[in-house]
Regions:
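Bacterial N-terminal signal peptides that target proteins for export
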Residues: 1-11
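Bacterial N-terminal signal peptides
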Residues: 9-19
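Extracytoplasmic small-molecule ligand-binding "clamshell" domains
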Residues: 23-93, 99, 257
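Periplasmic-binding protein-like
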Residues: 32, 109-113, 202-249, 251-274
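A conserved helix-loop-strand patch within extracytoplasmic ligand-binding domains
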Residues: 63, 92, 103-155, 160
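Short beta-strand-to-loop elements that line the ligand-binding cleft
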Residues: 64-71, 157, 174-182
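A ligand-binding cleft/hinge motif common to bilobed small-molecule-binding domains
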Residues: 73-77, 90-100, 165-170, 184-187, ...
């Protein structure tokens, strides 16, 4: 009888330990193609702000995390199909996306900007920052000026992004919008002269402009708010409320300990933490 009880107890403890192991395994989807948020080095290893932040958050959550590479245009579908449990891929928190998935609190602020080649007719446009959450008279004037400047121009963007949505919204008229699978392809065609301008996350396009060795310059406003969202956060399935809570608590801890600021300064060159 004693042996039987010990056997049952051993099985019970083993089941508990096994359950905890599985409960603490988290798969995080990332693109690996959007520096400095997430990218790969020459040896193919994932690097970037979010790669290091993911590792820190997983330590705070006491979780064993695996990074799963996913093309950008399949990022949200992949989450919903349970290919991974969370998204950390420079994804802006927008009302449109929140109809489909949940987001953690933001961990980094972002904006968007146009980039052109030096000497372009679009170079030197008004660089006033505009927040599209509040379309006051000054913002409306800037949008009208942009509509005039972009008329007849080809603007290149990564597909399935807030940047594509903005250009196709009618807020800046109807420029020709050319889409690409990755931001790298946008950058290559911009330099090759197949785009009059590229629109992207300001941190990503600045990183390219500074490191490409090409005469790429930023022009026009820095866009934020409205269709550009409220910062970047972790994307999580609607029904994973416990995981959402764990990520939020881990982000709080990382912020309090200065880890997010440290990583932002390392990868962005300034403190873009939220």
């Amino acid at each position: 009888m004693i042996i039987f009880k010990k056997t049952i107890l051993t099985i019970f403890v083993s089941l508990l330990l096994t359950a905890n192991v599985f409960a603490d395994k988290i798969r995080i989807g990332t693109e690996g193609a959007y520096p400095p948020w997430n990218a790969k080095n020459e040896s193919g290893k994932l690097i970037g702000f979010e790669i290091e932040l993911a590792n820190i958050l997983c330590i705070y959550m006491g979780a064993e995390c695996t990074l799963v590479e996913q093309d950008w245009d399949g990022m949200i579908p992949g989450l919903r199909l349970k290919k991974y449990d969370a998204i950390m891929a420079g994804m802006s928190i927008t009302e449109e996306r929140m109809k489909t998935i949940n987001f953690s609190q933001g961990y980094a602020s972002d904006g968007a900007s146009l980039a052109v080649m030096k000497g372009s007719a679009l170079e030197g446009m008004d660089t006033s920052a505009i927040n599209l959450s509040n379309t006051d008279s000054a913002t409306k004037k800037i949008l009208i000026d942009l509509t005039t400047s972009l008329a007849g121009k080809t603007v290149c963007v990564q597909t399935a992004t807030i940047h594509q949505n903005f250009l196709e919204s009618g807020l800046v008229g109807k420029p020709t919008v050319r889409t690409y699978k990755t931001q790298d392809e946008v950058n290559l065609d911009l330099v090759a002269g197949r785009c009059d301008a590229g629109l992207a996350d300001i941190l990503a396009i600045t990183d390219f402009a500074e490191k490409s060795g090409k005469p790429v310059v930023l022009t026009g406003p820095v866009y934020s708010g409205g269709p550009f969202g409220a910062g970047v956060g972790v994307g999580i399935r609607k029904d994973d409320t416990d995981l959402l809570k764990r990520f939020n608590e881990a982000i709080d801890t990382a912020r309090e300990q200065g880890k997010i600021s440290e990583l932002a300064i390392k990868w962005f060159g300034f403190d873009a933490s939220m």
